Design a protein with these regions (language model features):
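Short, flexible, basic/aromatic active-site loop/helix in glycosyltransferases
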Residues: 103-113, 120-142, 362-372, 379-400
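Conserved nucleotide-sugar donor-binding
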Residues: 74-75, 127, 144-160, 332-333, ...
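A conserved acidic beta->alpha catalytic loop
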Residues: 35-43, 293-301
Length: 508
């Protein structure tokens, strides 16, 4: 099979020749250098080295050069590189070999980045989140965003050359088409990458540099495509949630007046813990305690009543977070504290949430940020939480969301955002931020180690059922966000020269 090597280059006079020299050792069919926006001798160097040069006076914008090179290439295998990073030819051969043995795409294996004892970069979080939503956790952060990578020419045509200008979108299309993607080699392009102005310049409406902004926008666009193809949960399970019960539910009692704090406690078979959970909530100063018993045994219900709670009784399990919404609708307090029936949390660890609400915090979250420094690589659910906060331009919230208990929410937030959104915790959080409410982590309670291991937490093949459901919640939140903003969210618009790419696509 013939190999075409594609190298987009802009002002790479200092670094291009070593890149070309390594490539020439592979004896490829052709080396295409797409020179664009260059004011130095990049073009002359490429021509002098015997490369096929495609020249544009203007800068094309990131990845447009790749797509143009791919369309113009005559080989059977397309190998993509950058003009500023020389990769040993022995490594490059591993990418082309993977295509020769029948795979469609061969990616650079960068999963080692996630194992370092540091917090993941927002771009790594976005890459991991996309692979998780595509149910390919095994791909970690492997992506078409990173070089080197190789694609079979016929597969590139099926993906669409125009889509190669958006690597996360191309990656998504490839997986949805059932293409075979592998990561046969680990080439270090992180420590060798040139720091550019776009890596440092931060636009006014964002906490992220320009390059990060673009890449996150590209990942939102890829998720928009997944949602369009697979529905608002991206094809991920909703668990056994009974959503109808919430829309049909209107409390037939009038709200009590003068109640400051309510607590909502969903409970299944929690006879061992329920009485102590209620006792601590009372001790924290909560006046109204509502236990939403769903699929609960009689002992749990009896103990909840004896402990002084109001019990709303449903014979069937309602599914995750549905009881939260029902309990919140029934409750009367100005502030609602959410805890679970199977984790006993002492009053001293519950009070900070109520106090934060008194001091002006609208949504007071459990501060689990320390897990970012303790768990490497980041857990899939934590990655989804972090991604949501990155999309909301609140990276300061890290992995803190209303998915984790305990948390406290003010009544006016629930009234404005809508009680039914409590069924999908990330959607509730996203809406709260979009409405301008103050969302803050306030106190750490270790719920990770005390959480009961249930059957749905077990991995059988691919993702555990609980992980799939939680990821689906985050995709659903993203679907709402995209519907309210754009296919790139509120990240930098795409100003790349697609017009010049389409000229090539239409003329060749």
């Amino acid at each position: 099979l013939k190999v075409s090597v594609i190298i987009p280059a802009c002002n790479e006079a200092d670094s291009l020749l070593p890149v070309i020299k390594e490539v020439q050792k592979m004896k490829p069919f052709e080396i295409i250098v797409v020179v664009n926006g260059s004011s130095d001798t990049t073009k002359e160097i490429a021509e002098g080295a015997g490369c096929r040069v495609v020249y544009y006076e203007e800068a094309l914008g990131i990845n447009i050069g790749r797509a143009i090179g791919a369309k113009k290439a005559k080989g059977d295998i397309l190998l993509f590189l950058d003009g500023d990073i020389a990769v040993p030819h022995e490594e490059l051969m591993k990418y082309t070999k993977a295509i020769e043995t029948g795979h469609d795409i061969a990616l650079n294996n960068l999963s080692w980045i996630m194992k370092r004892k540091v917090r993941p970069h927002p771009v790594s979080v976005a890459k991991y989140m996309l692979n998780l939503c595509l149910q390919r956790e095994d791909l970690s952060i492997q992506a078409l965003t990173a070089i080197p990578h190789a694609i079979k020419k016929t597969s590139a045509a099926k993906i669409g050359y125009e889509n190669l200008a958006h690597p996360p979108l191309a990656h998504t299309i490839a997986l949805l088409k059932g293409m075979s993607i592998v990561a046969p080699c680990s080439s270090d392009v992180i420590y060798t990458n040139k720091i550019r102005t776009t890596h440092k310049t931060i636009p006014t409406n964002s906490p992220f540099p320009i390059s990060t902004n673009y890449i996150i926008g590209d990942h939102i666009q890829a998720l928009a495509h997944l949602i369009e193809e697979k529905g608002i949960r991206g094809g991920l399970t909703d668990g056994d949630r009974n959503r109808e019960v919430v829309s049909a539910y209107t409390p037939n009692v009038k709200r009590k007046t003068g109640v400051k704090y309510s607590a909502v406690i969903p409970a299944g078979e929690e006879k061992e813990t329920i009485a102590n959970v209620i006792k601590e909530v009372k001790k924290a100063g909560v006046e109204e305690i509502i236990v939403v018993a769903n699929g609960a045994d009689e002992v749990t219900v009896k103990r909840a009543i004896e402990a002084g709670a109001t019990v709303l009784h449903y014979k069937q399990r309602l599914g995750h977070n549905v009881p939260r919404a029902i309990g919140a609708m029934y409750s009367s307090g100005e502030v609602c504290l959410f805890v679970d029936g199977d984790i006993v949390i002492s009053a001293e660890h519950l009070r900070p949430y109520l106090e934060a609400a008194d001091q002006g915090v609208d949504v007071a979250l459990n501060n689990l940020e320390c897990l970012l420094d303790e768990v490497h690589p980041i857990h899939s659910v934590s990655a989804a939480k972090y991604f949501l906060n990155i999309v909301c331009k609140r990276p300061d919230l890290t992995i803190n969301t209303t998915t984790a208990i305990p948390h406290a929410i003010k009544r006016d937030v629930m009234e404005k955002v809508g009680y039914e959104s409590l069924i999908i915790p990330p959607l509730f959080q996203l809406k709260s931020i979009m409405y301008g409410f103050m969302v803050q982590p306030v106190h750490f309670v270790d719920v990770a180690r005390t959480n009961r291991i249930r059957k749905e937490h077990m991995k059988v093949k691919g993702l555990a059922a609980s992980t799939q459901r939680i990821l689906g919640d985050y995709v659903e939140a993203m679907a709402y966000y995209i519907s309210q903003t754009s296919e790139r969210g509120e990240f930098l618009p795409d100003i790349r020269r697609h017009d010049l790419l389409f000229e090539v696509l239409n003329n060749e």
